[in-house]
Amino acid sequence: MTQSNPNEQDVELNRTSLYWGLLLIFVLAVLFSNYFFN
């Protein structure tokens, strides 16, 4: 039980970091597209 909990937490951290990275890339893409089109 105690050994599986840290592993699950690591997976959750990896997923959250991945989603934050995708969100950051999406925001940067929108900002760059607005900058170039304007």
Curated annotation (Swiss-Prot):
Q: Does the keyword Amino-acid biosynthesis apply?
A: no
Task: Give the record's keywords alphabetically.
Answer: Chloroplast, Membrane, Photosynthesis, Photosystem II, Plastid, Reaction center, Thylakoid, Transmembrane, Transmembrane helix
Q: GO:BP terms for this protein?
A: photosynthesis
Locate the transmembrane regions by residue number. 17-37
According to its record, how does it sit in the membrane? Answer: Single-pass membrane protein
Q: Family membership, please give it.
A: Belongs to the PsbL family.
Q: What is this protein called?
A: Photosystem II reaction center protein L
Q: Which organism is it from?
A: Oenothera argillicola (Appalachian evening primrose)
Gene of this entry: psbL
